Amino acid sequence: LQKVDMIEKMGYDNLVISIKSSDVLMCVKAHQLIAERTNYPLHVGITEAGTVFSGNIKSAVGLGIILSQGIGDTIRVSLTGDPVEEIKSAKVILRTLGLRKGGIEVVSCPTCGRTRIDLIRLADQVETMAAEFDDLDGVKVAVMGCVVNGPGEAREADVGIAGGIGEGLLIRKGQVVRKVPEEELLTVLRRELEEMRSERRN
């Protein structure tokens, strides 16, 4: 805050303060301390967080703690990678904390012995597709690996798909709608989302 005082004495008071560290716990503590001592807006982030994998984890933990305490006005997810990934990660962090509306939440189960479909690839495809429907605020999509537990686990989702052997299920609000050939699961899910979008616009 000494530098803030120095800048204020020069006649400037339209400021945003940024305090960053690659140490998550240090960064959290620093933001807690500065938030107690100033009303200036704070730009928060875990700097030099690392690669997409480790950087996302550090950023989610650090920013999650800071933002959940009502601290922070703007954020930056700092990754060694494609800047587009930084934006995507920031949106998910904000949405998870209830600080941002818009976009679809995709939930998917971990793979297990009952999985009879390439769930990892399918979940990635659904997440990529979901980004095209950023206007569907509050919609939850489930991607499940089997038809045994899939419908039950997807009951809180607006729409979901569950994989089987050569075919899967289309699920709405936990209820099985119909069987779908495996190669058509993504297409059928897209159609469901397009119908939701059309209904909301009308």
PLM regions and their residue ranges:
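Catalytic alpha/beta core domains of metabolic enzymes, predominantly
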Residues: 1-131
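Fold-independent oxyanion-binding glycine-rich loops
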Residues: 20-21, 46-47, 69, 112, ...
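Conserved structured catalytic cores and adjacent interaction surfaces
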Residues: 83, 112-116, 147-153, 176
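Hydrophobic alpha-helical bundle architecture
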Residues: 125-155
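Beta-strand/loop-dominated core regions that host nucleotide or nucleotide-derived cofactor-binding catalytic loops
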Residues: 165-171, 175-198
